[in-house]
Amino acid sequence: MTQTSHALFHMAQQCIPGGVNSPVRAFRGVGGDPIFIDHAEGPFFWDVEGKRYLDYVGSWGPMIHGHGHPEVLAAVHAQVNKGLGFGAPTAIEVEMAELVCALVPGIESVRMTSSGTEAVMTAIRLARGYTGRDRIIKFEGNYHGHSDSLLVKAGSGALTLGQPSSAGVPREVSQNTLVLPYNDLPAVVEMMAQFGFDVATIIVEPVAGNMGCVPPEPGFLEGLRAVCDQYGCVLIFDEVMTGFRVALGGAQALYGVRPDLTTLGKIIGGGLPVGAVGGPREIMEYLAPTGPVYQAGTLSGNPVAMAAGLATLRLLTVPGFHERLAAQTAVLCEGLAERAEAAGVPMQINHVPGMFGWFFAEQPVRGFDTVMAADSKRYARFFHGLLARGVYLAPSAYEAGFLSAAHGDTEIAATLDAAEAVLATLKEDA
């Protein structure tokens, strides 16, 4: 007998908090029960009831080649046959580190972790150890994982649940976290004039992907670089989402701004749990065992994850890969903008190569305030309309969507046809 998503969700709620292992999956942001996935291939996945969906989440970013790319699967199978993990150094983690250092402009040395959250925790500790300072600056709606000091006005699932900050975070932990509006350079300059020489680091998503998709305004990242240089603090780019996606060298290559530290995740693991933090040797040598800043992990550099990530990154080096991905993203987003205008439904469409944010709003979306002003209820209706037509978007108005190389002209055309039909119903509802 075929199980249903509804039945599985009911069962899950009896043994998993909220029925899910990451809050956004619970569909709280759009209503209804989540669909439970059985298998995936290329740009599609199938739920446990056998229905096929065009996937624009891609495991929240890692599946840049689509699901089940044969070269990635072959690399994983080969490593599994050699061993799942050893708790000791391996050649494949050296290969991975060498490739990351070669591809990312701001990285000369890299330390592997098991998640993006761990990578950011390490980067913050490293910045504090390197500078001898305590304060950090982050931006509203930027999500950097669920470590205590960064769960202050965070984006992603925290916004979906209407909890921009988390219970269980002591005031003493968060009091050194200063929060500023994203894309507001004058606010940064003003804050640094007051606290600059106490600030260890400014951490930023160079493209905010956890409150939809909000690119940086011209001059914003350059301004952060200049301010950090002025006050001697560490600039961290959280490229867990943008790394290897928006360009081969990440957002720092796309925008031409080099941070002091870079955090990575998602694509670097090819779908398996991996994170990384990297930067110049001068800073990275502060990490144990060569320096006084402690970091460790039982599964860090896991060989199966390294195999998946290495195969994924090598496929990205094929000439023209990111140009094609950018072109397909533009076709999708410009096509949706045309259809929304024709339907008389106000939408703001933000996109960078391989990522997009679709907002039901009259005014351009450039920061936290304008994200929150968008119509999340209309997004929920749009989401369910597309879901019924076999198109799976992020189940939250505050998450970016992702394209893969497997999303071809046929899939994009089918998506736009479905969107056109749903937009017509939204206009009627209005």
From Swiss-Prot:
Q: Does the keyword Methyltransferase apply?
A: no
Identify which cofactors the protein needs according to its UniProt entry: pyridoxal 5'-phosphate
Supply the InterPro entries for this chain. 4pyrrol_synth_GluAld_NH2Trfase, Aminotrans_3, Aminotrans_3_PPA_site, PyrdxlP-dep_Trfase, PyrdxlP-dep_Trfase_major, PyrdxlP-dep_Trfase_small
Q: Where in the cell is it found?
A: Cytoplasm
Q: Which reaction does it catalyse?
A: (S)-4-amino-5-oxopentanoate = 5-aminolevulinate
Q: Name one Pfam family in it.
A: Aminotran_3
Alphabetically, the GO molecular function entries are: glutamate-1-semialdehyde 2,1-aminomutase activity; pyridoxal phosphate binding; transaminase activity
- Chain positions found as N6-(pyridoxal phosphate)lysine: 266
GO terms for biological process, alphabetical: protoporphyrinogen IX biosynthetic process
Q: Which CDD domains does the UniProt entry name for this protein?
A: OAT_like (cd00610)
The primary site where this protein sits is: cytoplasm
An annotated GO cellular component:
cytoplasm
Keywords (A to Z) from UniProt: Cytoplasm, Isomerase, Porphyrin biosynthesis, Pyridoxal phosphate
Q: In which pathway does it act?
A: Porphyrin-containing compound metabolism; protoporphyrin-IX biosynthesis; 5-aminolevulinate from L-glutamyl-tRNA(Glu): step 2/2
**Enzyme Commission no:** 5.4.3.8
Q: Give yes or no: UniProt keyword Membrane.
A: no
Extract the HAMAP family matched here.
HemL_aminotrans_3
Q: How does it assemble?
A: Homodimer.
The family note in this entry says:
Belongs to the class-III pyridoxal-phosphate-dependent aminotransferase family. HemL subfamily.
Q: Name it.
A: Glutamate-1-semialdehyde 2,1-aminomutase
This protein's encoding gene: hemL
